[in-house]
Amino acid sequence: MTTTRLLASLILGVALILSSGSNVSAYHSYVISVQKLKAALEKAPDHLHKGFFLIDVRSPKEHAGGIIPGTDRNIEFTQLKTRHIEIGAQPKDHIVVYCQSGHRSNIAAETLADLGYKHVYNVSGSMNAWEAAGYELQPATR
């Protein structure tokens, strides 16, 4: 490949990345199934010692309708950039986020990853999948 073609390919690649409108992040989030989340919650000795933070990123109104047992906090996904410190997590800690369908929690997971958290998990299907699996909900505490 000639130097000119190589340079043209490089410029085109950078232009495509910049025009895509997406941020390039050094971190990324992962996906976890409701079955794996349920198993992790059942293995935990108690709510406070489960080894990860479980965050509901739905609206307070949705949160009030019931939560996944073991949920630590409700922070609406649109507020995570300014309120993430309330989670109490360090960048190396594991954070699991869920919403109603998985869309908002996917955005939340990427937001947290962009903020430097290295182990962020989005619950696939979120509350819809949790309820479809027949798992119980817990009343919200606040």
Task: Tell where the protein language model's regions lie, with residue ranges.
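Short, surface-exposed ligand- or partner-binding patches at beta-edge/loop junctions that are enriched
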Residues: 98-99
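Rhodanese-like catalytic fold shared by cysteine-dependent sulfurtransferases
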Residues: 2-10, 16-52, 60-94, 103-142
